[in-house]
From Swiss-Prot:
InterPro entries: FAD/NAD-bd_sf, FAD/NAD-binding_dom, Fd--NADP_Rdtase_type_2, Ferredoxin-NADP_redctase_2
List of residues binding FAD: D38, Q46, Y51, V91, F125, D292, T333
Pfam family, one: Pyr_redox_2
Cofactor: FAD
Protein name from the UniProt record: Ferredoxin--NADP reductase
Record's signal peptide: none
Entry's family note: Belongs to the ferredoxin--NADP reductase type 2 family.
Organism from which the protein derives: Gluconacetobacter diazotrophicus (strain ATCC 49037 / DSM 5601 / CCUG 37298 / CIP 103539 / LMG 7603 / PAl5)
Length: 341
C-alpha cells in the first residue's frame, strides 16, 4: 500500500461548483496556482448533480443556459491554467494559519496551501423526503425521484410534481412537453416563484398541459414491487384523491450540512459562513468563502454573485501569496490570459 500523496498549492479551493471553478480562473489570472477539491466525483456542484438540463436564465450574456453547458464553459475557461482536481474527496481537517495551512482529506491526501477558498455551496446536501409509507421501495426503482438529470427519461410518463416553489414550477414547465400528463400538487392555493414562471404556468394550465391540484398534499403511494400506479393526495379536511401517476417528483427543498467545515474555528450560521463583504474573508484569517456558503448583509444567492465573490477573494489572497509583488488591477481585455502557471 502506497502512502497518500502530499500536494502543495497557493490556494486550496474546497468546492468545484460554478463559484469554485470561477475562483480558480481568477486565481489563474493573477498567476496564483490553485487546487480544486470536491466531494462529488465530477465538477459542477448542484449544476451537474441536480439540474444539468435545467435552463438557467440569470447568467449575463446567456438568455438561457443549461447547468451542464455552464459548467462546460467554466471548464474551458480554466483550461489554460491546468488546475488539478481531487474529486470524490471530502476535506476533513484544516489547521495552520494565514499563509500556511494544511488540509487533510478522507482519502488521506495532505494539501499545503497559503490560503483557502471555501466554495462548498450549502455543504453536503440531500432532498427533504416526504413522510410516505413504502417510499424506499419506490425510490429504489426510480418511480420517486428528487432530481431530473435527463428530461428524455420522462417521455410519455404521467408525473405528479409536488411543491410550491421555483423548482416545482420550473420542472413542471420543463417537462410539460415530454410527459403525457403532469399534476402540480401544492398544499396552498398560491405558488411562490418568479413572476415570469407563474405567467408561463398559468398559460400551461389554460392550455391543458399542466393540472394544478390545490390545496392538497401528498398522502400515500399506490403500487406493487416499486412500480408506481397512483399517488394519493389529501386536503387538510381529509378529502382524498388518487392521481394515476407512474412518477413522483417531490420538490421540498434540500437539507444541508456544512459537515467538518463547521468545526474549523470560523463563525458559521445555519450552513453559511459570515464573511467581510469587500474581500470574502471569514473570521479565520486567510480562509475565504464564496458562493452560496458565504453570508453578509444584502447577499443574493445567485451564481453571478458567486463569480464576483471569487474575483474579490482572489485579489485579497494575492498579497498573502505574493507579499513582495504589487498587484496592479488590469482588465482582461488589456492583459489577456496569462501563460500557464
Amino acid at each position: 500500500m502506497t502512502d497518500a500523496p502530499t500536494l502543495t498549492t497557493d490556494v486550496a479551493i474546497i468546492g468545484a461548483g460554478p463559484a469554485g471553478l470561477f475562483a480558480a480562473f481568477e486565481c489563474g489570472m493573477l498567476k496564483l496556482d490553485s487546487l480544486l477539491i470536491d466531494a462529488l466525483d465530477c465538477v459542477g456542484g448542484q449544476c451537474a448533480a441536480l439540474y444539468p438540463e435545467k435552463p438557467i436564465y440569470d447568467i449575463p450574456g446567456h438568455p438561457a443556459i443549461a447547468g451542464a453547458a455552464l459548467i462546460e464553459g467554466l471548464e474551458q475557461q480554466i483550461a489554460p491554467f491546468d488546475v488539478p482536481r481531487l474529486l470524490g474527496r471530502r476535506v476533513e481537517r484544516l489547521s495552520g494559519h494565514r499563509g500556511a495551512f494544511t488540509l487533510g482529506t478522507d482519502r488521506g491526501e495532505t494539501i499545503h496551501a497559503r490560503a483557502v477558498i471555501i466554495a462548498a455551496g450549502a455543504g453536503a446536501f440531500g432532498p427533504n423526503r416526504p413522510p410516505l409509507a413504502g417510499l424506499d421501495g419506490f425510490e429504489a426503482t426510480g418511480a420517486v425521484q428528487y432530481y431530473v438529470r435527463r428530461r428524455a427519461d420522462f417521455a410519455g410518463t404521467r408525473i405528479v410534481i409536488a411543491g410550491g416553489g421555483d423548482s416545482a414550477i420550473d420542472w413542471a414547465l420543463a417537462l410539460k412537453d415530454e410527459a403525457e400528463k403532469i399534476w402540480l400538487v401544492h398544499r396552498r392555493d398560491r405558488f411562490r416563484a418568479a413572476p415570469e414562471s407563474l405567467r408561463q404556468l398559468d398559460e400551461a394550465v389554460a392550455a391543458g398541459r399542466i393540472e394544478k391540484i390545490v390545496p392538497y398534499q401528498l398522502h400515500g403511494l399506490r403500487g406493487t414491487d416499486g412500480a408506481l400506479e397512483g399517488v394519493e393526495v389529501a386536503t387538510l379536511d381529509g378529502d382524498t384523491r388518487i392521481l394515476p401517476a407512474d412518477r413522483l417528483l417531490p420538490f421540498f427543498g434540500l437539507s444541508t450540512d456544512l459537515g467538518p467545515i463547521a468545526h474549523w474555528g470560523m463563525d458559521s450560521i445555519r450552513s453559511t459562513i459570515p464573511v467581510v463583504p469587500s474581500s470574502c474573508e471569514t473570521t479565520l484569517p486567510g480562509v475565504f468563502a464564496v458562493g452560496d456558503v458565504a453570508a453578509y448583509p444584502g447577499k443574493l444567492k445567485l451564481i453571478l454573485q458567486g463569480f464576483s465573490e471569487g474575483a474579490m477573494a482572489a485579489h485579497a489572497i494575492h498579497p498573502i501569496v505574493r507579499p513582495d509583488t504589487a498587484l496592479h488591477f488590469e482588465y482582461s481585455t488589456s492583459k489577456g490570459v496569462p501563460d500557464r502557471i
